[in-house]
């Protein structure tokens, strides 16, 4: 009932709005750089007349500062970004796209973002680090990790023994998920892992033949495969996680966090965001919208070409899970990580205060 009321409120606000233009995001490079701040990508068609950016602000009185990572977390937001550019949202929005979590963690801790899309384990770490000033509000990405190989020697996890895997995500979900699977398979001491800063950097190394074995998330798996026909997906870490966890948890890669003060002081804006973001995810994940969603992903600078975006989107495990279901799923995942390595969740299993259920 709460979600229905929130959605009804957001829809009522949205229907009274006009439209406005925005600025396109800069395409991602393979080098680590400062995160990009953009109002929103340009709308894909001309906005309606008699519109202004102030129209949205008159409804909630709030411009939300939103950060996301260049990958599935941002891909689920692209329709919201376009709607914001048209002025068709209840909130004003300023989006920041980053290449890695390290680029935005400091700003989240300082309260410089109202909302951010981050790895799920990082939500727990931020909750501890800020003494409860950051809360988990929704899950947005399930399992998207794959081991990609230049060859055909890896047929099972046991084949990783004695190998070196290149990966990204040190200190976040990819590292701890891989470590958990290796530990459960008795390979913790027989596999070396070398970390790179950004997914795009690692995908480029694979494509150029400079790495033979890598752990990558979508959509960068699709990007690498499209650029080098000698590459193949060797292992799906979601399947390997399920085998290791034996039903105890679900691999949950990404989530939405928000400042506790923002949630408490701006309940209408928070409810409107959740409704607008859920609608964006529904649009992006609808097969009927694949062409349009791929165009928006490229328009936002997340991926360089529409064919790659179209190939990647169905495999990005983009989702929206909020409320009690979010709490149940996330808590099970974090408990598994904690039991495997307490530092994965900031040293202690978070209490129920982590979860914002509306």
Where are the model-predicted features located?
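Conserved C-terminal helix/tail region of periplasmic/extracytoplasmic solute-binding proteins
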Residues: 331-358
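Sec-dependent N-terminal signal peptides of Gram-positive bacterial secreted proteins and lipoproteins
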Residues: 3-23
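Secondary-structure end/capping motifs
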Residues: 263-340
